[in-house]
């Protein structure tokens, strides 16, 4: 058990509120709490009492003692529920520090829960995901991960994989058993089952990352093409100033919305053109930089001279910026102002026709965006995931494919080696084998007090 010292932090958000919670965890948590309250605390009882700094009353509230290992961290934990005034809470923190506690680092309570086997690494990350979820579906999916749905799937997969590894390695170590790799259907069927499960988890992880991290959309195009109007139409409110004057948007304008429960981070940028205006030029530089960070680019145009516009044609539309736009970026061409046309072309491939001002075609555009990122809305089976999970699963998938190749070639030792590599990648998801650097990076992204 992790029992180095005792930590303290405010567990509720900053600012004023009806209640503020202070969390203390560690070997001296009970002793410190009893010094602060001058009470003997019973495990799992709510005790209403004063909180003192020496003999001076700071506040009164409810104190709950959770005796190890039946606590969030697996250590002795005390929660002090006081009035939610930052000055009062900080006075209680100072009193706890005077009694021997130290300030917790970001995510240290959850890190201790992980080190004390109360949570695996995927569940620990889900704690942050559920706190930061920006949609109802994202919150529900994070709850599934926190309950262990993702971890159970990985652990079930590991169980099958380890059994297969043992079987393969036994056949190598004990050749007298005369197992023929090319003919043994047990190995073939087990490997094929593992392959299919990893593929399914791979697809689920992709959905989970979309829900956990959202999609970043960048609106780009020439001035006055209707980018700001499109931002307002997608957001359903007036987020950006819209005028008939080209170059109105001179800086980055951000809006966070949901499309079918999927978080979307939409960024409106300055119109791309050569400008002598220092402020507008800086906005254009920022726009180019943001394009490189996008999951998708919505290239807004009101030019209908070529409805079959392709990426190479952007060189003609904005030649001065063509070389600065990544050639592998996912671009949807949004043809705006169709209300001015007598005949509206049909949507096709990456070309969507809309009128942002009149809200025509916006739903079709939203549907197109979700399809482009591969979101399937199967929220009953989706759990949140991180990019590192996707990387691990993708690597595991590549090596399980190599394992199948080695099986077909009859290379038992290389097959066993590939299975071991797959196991290591899967173990990294739940934290079975994780470096201190990785753990530090993960938990440092948490808020203080969690």
From Swiss-Prot:
It comes from the Bacteria. The keyword Kinase does not apply. GO terms for molecular function: GTP binding; GTPase activity; metal ion binding. Its main location: cytoplasm. Its EC number is 3.6.-.-. SUPFAM superfamilies: P-loop containing nucleoside triphosphate hydrolases, TrmE connector domain. Mg(2+) binds at residues 228, 249. It is found in: Cytoplasm. InterPro entries: G_TrmE, GTP-bd, GTP-bd_TrmE_N, GTPase_MnmE, MnmE_dom2, MnmE_helical, P-loop_NTPase, Small_GTP-bd. PROSITE patterns: G_TRME. GO terms for cellular component: cytosol. It is an enzyme of class 3 (hydrolase). GTP binds at residues 224-229, 243-249, 268-271. (6S)-5-formyl-5,6,7,8-tetrahydrofolate binds at residues 23, 79, 118, 450. Residues 214-374 form the TrmE-type G domain. Keywords: Cytoplasm, GTP-binding, Hydrolase, Magnesium, Metal-binding, Nucleotide-binding, Potassium, tRNA processing. Binds 1 potassium ion per subunit. One of its GO terms (biological process) is tRNA wobble uridine modification. PANTHER family: TRNA MODIFICATION GTPASE GTPBP3, TRNA MODIFICATION GTPASE GTPBP3, MITOCHONDRIAL. This is tRNA modification GTPase MnmE. It comes from Francisella tularensis subsp. tularensis (strain SCHU S4 / Schu 4). The gene is mnmE.
